[in-house]
Amino acid sequence: MATPHINAVPGAFAETMLFPGDPLRAKYIAETFLENVEQVTDVRNMLGFTGTYKGKRISVMGSGMGIPSASIYAYELIKEYGVKNLIRVGTCGAISTDVKVRDVIIAMGACTDSKVNRLRFKDHDFAAIADYSLLSAVVDSAKEHGTQIRVGNVFSADLFYTPDPQMFDVMEKMGVLGVEMEAAGLYGVAHELGAKALCVVTVSDHIRTGEKTTSDERQTTFNDMIIMTLDAAITL
């Protein structure tokens, strides 16, 4: 049955889904890496697709930008469509000087300035962590592909244009590897509903040094990350 934000029919989505922010990136993943692809939802142009990868049924759908948007789609996908494994794939900005542009970060945990998980957890701090089985599968796949990865915490920011750049100093002191905008909310929804979630992001730019990837570098690194993640997804 359709939800307010998804018009797919029951059974349209696979149990495992890649979850990029950009719906056009979802379209690119589906058309580039999947076979037998079908577009299954398009409400608000938030495109979702289902196909197969090496014979296994896989879905991919955009989440939009930020925790509120990602949380809505994750909730409806898990609650109404039975999605069990949600893997966010996207980009982030690096903070630590030992994290390099084009590195892949696997978010073991997600700090945040959002109150969304406190709302879920009676105003207490909730440890927003990834599912270990998903994390382990992607780490193993990265080793097989020879992909340079970092495993640790990210920071899920509510504001893209922060009014407090000194917060980056605190993040670096606490060992945060990168900044993005969705993981903490995704992890909270997954825990609330008994699903599994993981965030895998490539470093597209460095907040400290100002270094940025070119569009070609970004696409190549992104492709490598997607293949690595899809190869992990088919083992679940």
UniProtKB/Swiss-Prot annotation:
Reaction equation(s) it catalyzes: a purine D-ribonucleoside + phosphate = a purine nucleobase + alpha-D-ribose 1-phosphate; a purine 2'-deoxy-D-ribonucleoside + phosphate = a purine nucleobase + 2-deoxy-alpha-D-ribose 1-phosphate
Marked site: Important for catalytic activity: 218
Binding site for a purine D-ribonucleoside: 5, 180-182, 204-205
GO terms of molecular function: purine-nucleoside phosphorylase activity
UniProt: phosphate binding residues: 21, 25, 44, 88-91
Class of the enzyme per the UniProt entry, highest EC level: transferase
CDD domains cross-referenced by the UniProt entry: PNP_EcPNPI-like
Record key words, sorted: Glycosyltransferase, Transferase
One GO process term, biological-process aspect: purine nucleoside catabolic process
UniProt cross-references to HAMAP family, sorted A to Z: Pur_nucleosid_phosp
Family indicated by similarity: Belongs to the PNP/UDP phosphorylase family.
Free-text function comment from the UniProt entry: Catalyzes the reversible phosphorolytic breakdown of the N-glycosidic bond in the beta-(deoxy)ribonucleoside molecules, with the formation of the corresponding free purine bases and pentose-1-phosphate.
Name of the protein: Purine nucleoside phosphorylase DeoD-type
